[in-house]
Swiss-Prot record:
GO terms for cellular component: cytoplasm
Similarity comment text for this entry: Belongs to the aldehyde dehydrogenase family.
Enzyme Commission code(s) on record: 1.2.1.3
One matching Pfam family: Aldedh
Single GO MF annotation: 3-aminopropanal dehydrogenase (NAD+) activity
Subcellular localization: Cytoplasm
Origin superkingdom: Eukaryota
UniProt protein name: Aldehyde dehydrogenase [NAD(P)+] 1
Protein's organism: Saccharomyces cerevisiae (strain ATCC 204508 / S288c)
Keyword NAD listed: yes
Active site annotation, chain numbering: 268 (proton acceptor), 302 (nucleophile)
Length: 506
């Protein structure tokens, strides 16, 4: 019999836990049908943590059947009020286990515990509280008078069985963005965590069961995207799929969904988000926000302000201060334990990502011969894991691959603009449209930018401080649909129209 649990010790926090390693189907942990496993690695050390069961197409079928049976027989008949109660139960359990969940995110994803992972759990608590209160409020239809003898009304009904695929940069937070909204709307779920970062969601499954959710309502199938993700996207008995990840893979999900049963699709994909700094901006505050917006989470953020455009009159001053802030506040050298409060910039997720980001840095330095500043020498001496120092390229032309491609690491490009029209043209010159930021004291200019930028989120005099009550999603190749806020429930509901004829003659 395969091992379905292992003991994990985190001595820095004096935390011991029993870590599930199996697939979670029908409220039970079980082995994969072929017994294959995936090894997960601590990105701060490059050393293995453990191995967990890897799902395949047969396991996906099993999970879908469990979700369908749960929806048809139990969950579709459960009141919205009761769904909210289950989510409230879950909220209490997350509060009790938040330190353990944050510790698993640090261990498995390399997130600095004090500055990142605990913040993720704070957001998870906020959004679970929000969706618990939303379950019996956002599923209401409307009455529409038509004529003297006719009216119509609408019903908001769940899709049924929903598949969700979540990324490795915010493993548990992104899972909860999707999972809690789908459950509040009345769907059953099969969710696939990233193969790099499955531990926290598998542990979270124990809380799902303790909260009282009926068997089959939530099913977790860790595994490789090319196998499990493909099986979910192409499955004929899944009614909707929600994906967060790269634009390339999002295209595969959309294609597979269209070629199977035309299931509804929500995509949150890549970004190359611009931050614009006008000459009237509070420069120190703008720099603090922009530094956090690119270096937080080691730049592994789809909304990271990885392109910075600065008005030419203040460009040199901005660059000088930006480098000083990066060195003073975000340097990684000698701070290689993500459980230590001194560690602010953790490792990137894997050797593959490390090599990919390194190749962009080398291209900028050697092939494009760009001006470059790094907070530490690179590779970093003494680092065992996948640590990359914050890296700033300046005077970067619009044609540069570093400016056009999503690098997904602590690498930022800085360029200058002359006036508003120039800034807007540069900011919109991308295939992406996830987020943007503008720094100015001119209220008119700020609102003009919010109107004119082609992006799903606009921050004015801040960056990357989203709120769970506000819709989130992208324009252009950054995605389809919205999550969070009321949209976080609406995206998992369909509208049905009912026509009532009161005339006795017709």
């Amino acid at each position: 019999m395969p091992t379905l649990y292992t003991d994990i010790e985190i001595p820095q926090l004096k935390i011991s836990l029993k870590q599930p390693l199996g697939l979670f189907i029908n409220n039970e942990f079980c082995p994969s049908s072929d017994g294959k496993t995936i090894e997960t690695v601590n990105p701060a050390t490059g050393e293995p943590i453990t191995s967990f069961q890897a799902a395949n197409e047969k396991d996906v079928d099993k999970a879908v059947k469990a979700a369908r049976a749960a929806f048809d027989n139990v969950w579709s008949k459960t009141s919205s009020e009761q769904r909210g109660i289950y989510l409230s139960n879950l909220l209490k359990l997350i509060e009790e286990e938040q330190d353990t969940l944050a510790a698993l995110e640090t261990l498995d994803a390399g997130k600095p515990y004090h500055s990142n992972a605990k913040g993720d759990l704070a957001q998870i608590l906020q959004l679970t509280r929000y969706f618990a209160g939303s379950a019996d409020k956002f599923d209401k239809g409307a009455t529409i008078p038509l004529t003297f003898n006719k009216f119509a009304y609408t019903l908001k009904v769940p899709f049924g069985v929903v598949a969700q695929i979540v990324p490795w940069n915010y493993p548990l937070a992104m899972a909860c963005w999707k999972l809690q909204g789908a459950l509040a709307a009345g769907n059953t779920v099969i969710i696939k965590p990233a193969e790099n970062t499955s531990l926290s969601l598998l542990y979270f499954a124990t809380l799902i069961k303790k909260a009282g959710f009926p068997p089959g309502v939530v099913n977790i199938v860790p595994g490789y995207g090319s196998l499990v993700g493909q099986a979910l996207a192409s499955h004929m008995d899944i009614d909707k799929i929600s994906f967060t990840g790269s634009t390339k893979v999002g295209g595969f999900v959309l294609e597979a969904s269209g070629q199977s049963n035309l299931k509804d699709v929500t995509l949150e994909c890549g970004g190359k988000s611009p931050a614009l700094v006008f000459e009237d901006a509070d420069l120190d505050k703008a720099i603090d926000w922009i530094a956090a917006g690119i270096f937080y989470n080691s730049g592994q953020n789809c909304t990271a302000n990885s392109r910075v455009y600065v008005q030419s009159s203040i460009y040199d001053k901005f660059v000088e201060k930006f480098k000083e802030t990066a060195k003073k506040e975000w340097d990684v050298a000698g701070k290689f334990d993500p459980f230590d409060e001194k560690c602010i910039v953790g490792p990137v997720i894997s050797s593959t990502q490390y090599d990919r980001i390194k190749s962009y840095i080398e291209r900028g330095k050697r092939e494009e011969k760009l001006d470059m500043f790094q907070t530490s020498e690179f590779p970093i001496g003494g680092a065992k894991g996948y640590f990359i120092p914050p890296t700033i390229f300046t005077d970067v032309p619009q044609t540069s691959k570093l400016l056009q491609d999503e690098i997904f690491g602590p690498v930022v490009v800085v360029s200058k603009f002359t006036n508003y029209d120039d800034a807007l043209k540069l900011a919109n010159d991308t295939c992406y449209g996830l987020a943007s930021a503008v720094f100015t004291k001119d209220v008119k200019k700020a609102h003009m930018f919010a109107r004119d930028i082609k992006a799903g989120t606009v921050w004015i005099n801040s960056s990357n401080d989203e709120d769970v009550t506000v819709p989130f999603g992208g324009f252009k190749m950054s995605g389809i649909g919205r999550e969070l806020g009321q949209s976080g429930v609406d995206t998992y509901l369909q509208t049905k129209a009912v026509h009532i004829n009161l005339s006795l003659d017709n």
